[in-house]
Amino acid sequence: MANGGGGGGGGSSGSSGGGGGGGGGETALRMSSNIHANHLSLDASSSSSSSSSSSSSSSSSVHEPKMDALIIPVTMEVPCDSRGQRMWWAFLASSMVTFFGGLFIILLWRTLKYLWTVCCHCGGKTKEAQKINNGSSQADGTLKPVDEKEEVVAAEVGWMTSVKDWAGVMISAQTLTGRVLVVLVFALSIGALVIYFIDSSNPIESCQNFYKDFTLQIDMAFNVFFLLYFGLRFIAANDKLWFWLEVNSVVDFFTVPPVFVSVYLNRSWLGLRFLRALRLIQFSEILQFLNILKTSNSIKLVNLLSIFISTWLTAAGFIHLVENSGDPWENFQNNQALTYWECVYLLMVTMSTVGYGDVYAKTTLGRLFMVFFILGGLAMFASYVPEIIELIGNRKKYGGSYSAVSGRKHIVVCGHITLESVSNFLKDFLHKDRDDVNVEIVFLHNISPNLELEALFKRHFTQVEFYQGSVLNPHDLARVKIESADACLILANKYCADPDAEDASNIMRVISIKNYHPKIRIITQMLQYHNKAHLLNIPSWNWKEGDDAICLAELKLGFIAQSCLAQGLSTMLANLFSMRSFIKIEEDTWQKYYLEGVSNEMYTEYLSSAFVGLSFPTVCELCFVKLKLLMIAIEYKSANRESRSRKRILINPGNHLKIQEGTLGFFIASDAKEVKRAFFYCKACHDDVTDPKRIKKCGCRRLEDEQPPTLSPKKKQRNGGMRNSPNTSPKLMRHDPLLIPGNDQIDNMDSNVKKYDSTGMFHWCAPKEIEKVILTRSEAAMTVLSGHVVVCIFGDVSSALIGLRNLVMPLRASNFHYHELKHIVFVGSIEYLKREWETLHNFPKVSILPGTPLSRADLRAVNINLCDMCVILSANQNNIDDTSLQDKECILASLNIKSMQFDDSIGVLQANSQGFTPPGMDRSSPDNSPVHGMLRQPSITTGVNIPIITELAKPGKLPLVSVNQEKNSGTHILMITELVNDTNVQFLDQDDDDDPDTELYLTQPFACGTAFAVSVLDSLMSATYFNDNILTLIRTLVTGGATPELEALIAEENALRGGYSTPQTLANRDRCRVAQLALLDGPFADLGDGGCYGDLFCKALKTYNMLCFGIYRLRDAHLSTPSQCTKRYVITNPPYEFELVPTDLIFCLMQFDHNAGQSRASLSHSSHSSQSSSKKSSSVHSIPSTANRPNRPKSRESRDKQKKEMVYR
């Protein structure tokens, strides 16, 4: 028996048995050593354990050579078939019978159903024919049994439908139960696949006891669940045949039945369990059910990966099965021992066509499978792998989410994100003069940044983050935490070809952001003024809560209009809200003084309690002399603190105003630290301090801070130019009641005549037809125009509108008297001007000369050499792709005008005897007379009275140029040219030495105020964020008084509405305006020759309530030798000790003059009531020289006390 034990069959004590056993051992040796070697000894011990077992083995061994079957391992714990016969066919048969049996039943059912339907159809036709033949002879009762049958059938159909619907709900991913079941089935399928990976290390077929094998028990439980889920799917399926042929169904057929067979036979066959890997194909669907995958790229990536991996693992399982089993027709003798993971490796090198040859298929089935697999696998590898790599490589590098930092604000910047727009924004937003900007900037754009922009982000990585996405997508808004952002800033493309489309895009961005979070503060750039009205249609848009729209066209044309009133003002204001560092120049050149002024910016600060009770001019003087600060305005808020609409910005309000607690002041200073002196100033501690740098927080201030505040702060805290302070509303006290026009004005007021718009902010006239204001060239030539504004406009019928109303409105502000209004003459295409006329027909003194600004005949016809200002605009700039050619029309027009030569203009004036008054022009006014426009010598130049850089010589003064010299050459015509491309500024002045790479603000044309580019307005975005009052102040200065209420009115009617002159509307005229003060003559002439700017500042403020804030100086005034150059440059906020020269023009804010509206022909003295005495101001001829006023009181207090009447000349 021991000798016979060498066979795998158990052997016997006889020779034949031993021989049989030997044959069995020989077969066992041909099989894999790792499968059978350890089981041979176990078989021997099993045969010697009992006699009954030995006799049974002996009898079985006799028949084994006849069966010629392979021997499988037999353990002593498992009561297995001692003959060692393979039973793989039983496992496979169970699957095949299930699949084909079910398929046969489905086909049989369909066939019977089809036959039954055909038969019923024929029978139905027969019954119908019988029913027609019988007609009405049959009683109604004969049809009741049929109805009852139909009700029974309907009931049955309803029951089956209910069950089917219930099953569909159970497996549908639309319900929570369905999603749970789908996810659970997928998870259990992966679990079954893991069990297969574990069992793959065992033999392909082995005897196992179900009650002792833990993995088999788990696999059995999984498959029971799969069977139940299969039943639900079968019930819910509409087409049973297609369901039976689905991949998931085939997987169940070849994995579920073999498990039950293995329990019955007490043996396990690895078989086709690897098909569970096909369930991985549904991985992307599972992730979508769980809302993990939301983007198309991520879904596609997971789909490709799941299909590739599942195919790979499934094919490896098949190779593992056939290679470890062998070919059936070879009696399973050509097998080889390969682990599953070696098969995975073999399939990978096969798909990739590498084929190292270290592992290969030996069986015919394996090789045949490899032949077909390499075709499909190679195609899949060649297409799927590159696409997977591309998707992974193209995954959004900036697709994460923003993580808010505790204690640190963040803003979201979106819209037009380019290298230029971002660099300009960051340069101003993160400027060192803003104190410590503890704000993180999050950029959101749907296009990934290029290398240059990416490098810019990396340089500012501590404060800047970029995320790829769109604000129109709520998911992307959630990624950047828009709900917790301090504000959202939307940048516009200033150079786009279609401004209306760009505005529409930004409006859609505002709608999307406001829809996601209505309370977010939004600051957006708009290109066209008329598109601002669409923002008012957004329900959550609220300018009272900080929402602002920066209209570039409105501000650009407003700046240019102010330059028509005081040339150089556009440059000064643009420099004030732009953050620029101080550049020190040692040489005594004009750049030295210009750059000293450029370093000044606009800031706000709450005034110290030491200023309480003082008048505005007194506080202004104290701040300028002692604190070295220039205060130009304060914030006024009515007693109703809950309403922000009652808040106003008062610019140089005059001496009637008394400051109380919590007044917010607007200052011009070089940095934010200097402005804090106004808050820290204490009369008790700092009264004797001469160095303003020593004015810091004192002990008195600390005691005040320790006291509990009486009013809670309400103003929103922002970093940068503003600081937090108790926000008590500044209560303003007037010595006099609300200013009302004098009795003589009220008596002469014609209530039936509308001279102003309904708000009283602008001059108004009845709408005029464009034909009434058109001048022909001959009519214009016969009309002697002088002191007017010539607007050269390039545009055609297809050009985008630039909004000329924004240019005209500041020139028609009601704080000018009618006779002070400059006549405006447009020179350009009549087709274009017709499109703009709808917004211009309510303004007086406007004429049109159809033509082209490049025609010298047209320019001579409008007397361009006698104009106060020539404005060159173009509506065609953004239609050209080449940026260097965008400004070609404006540059050509500018050079054309400068090259013109003019004869003696006095001869031209003689044509006035044969001329006529142009439409809207009142020739009866002395200011409109040709001689007045030519030879006037004003000491103060205001809206209509700015000379063409002409100072007439007087004894003791150095005349730089004469009248005829100025008029003979076009180079002396004052003009301002709008540019799109900053670098094109180099072409405006042929005699300057500006480098092409010089920044715009450092170039001579910009410093002189003869060029303006819209790019300078980019700084307003960050300035508005840090202090929303800055935008209000700038708009008040440049628009002539436009308010949100007026914008709402224009949005309704797209035109100004005329209003009657009432005391309330006339009171709105009482507001400050910009003027230029000449030092050649007048009361300040003594200071013009070597005097100090500080003395001029104090004298103008005390005497005339005029607030000086800058100088417009000749470029070569610092030279000791005379120069013929008449170019001037801007000096902003010079220091107290700054030396003046006689040719300087002083920028000042002057009060409204109520008496200038009376007849200018009379030079007699006039007196007014006390209401107007506090509002005395000066116009062109209103300030006499000091020598002519011997009775003038010595002190301002005595003048106020005596209420002495002003003398007008």
Swiss-Prot record:
Gene: Kcnma1
Residue ranges of the region described as Segment S9: 784-804
SUPFAM superfamilies in UniProt: NAD(P)-binding Rossmann-fold domains, Voltage-gated potassium channels
Listed InterPro entries: Ion_trans_dom (IPR005821), K_chnl_BK_asu (IPR003929), K_chnl_Slo-like (IPR047871), NAD(P)-bd_dom_sf (IPR036291), RCK_N (IPR003148), Slowpoke-like_C (IPR048735)
This protein's name: Calcium-activated potassium channel subunit alpha-1
Sequence motif Selectivity for potassium, location on chain: 353-356
Alphabetized Gene3D superfamilies for the sequence: 1.10.287.70, NAD(P)-binding Rossmann-like Domain
Membrane-traversing stretches: 88-108, 180-200, 216-236, 241-261, 266-286, 302-322, 369-389
Region called Segment S7, residue ranges: 557-577
Domain comment, as recorded: The S0 segment is essential for the modulation by the accessory beta subunits KCNMB1, KCNMB2, KCNMB3 and KCNMB4.
Phosphoserine modifications at: S712, S725, S729, S925, S929, S1195, S1198
Molecular functions (GO terms): actin binding; calcium-activated potassium channel activity; identical protein binding; large conductance calcium-activated potassium channel activity; ligand-gated monoatomic ion channel activity involved in regulation of presynaptic membrane potential; metal ion binding; potassium channel activity; protein-containing complex binding
Activation/inhibition comment: Ethanol and carbon monoxide-bound heme increase channel activation.
PANTHER family xref list: CALCIUM-ACTIVATED POTASSIUM CHANNEL ALPHA CHAIN, CALCIUM-ACTIVATED POTASSIUM CHANNEL SUBUNIT ALPHA-1
Region Segment S8: start-end pairs: 614-634
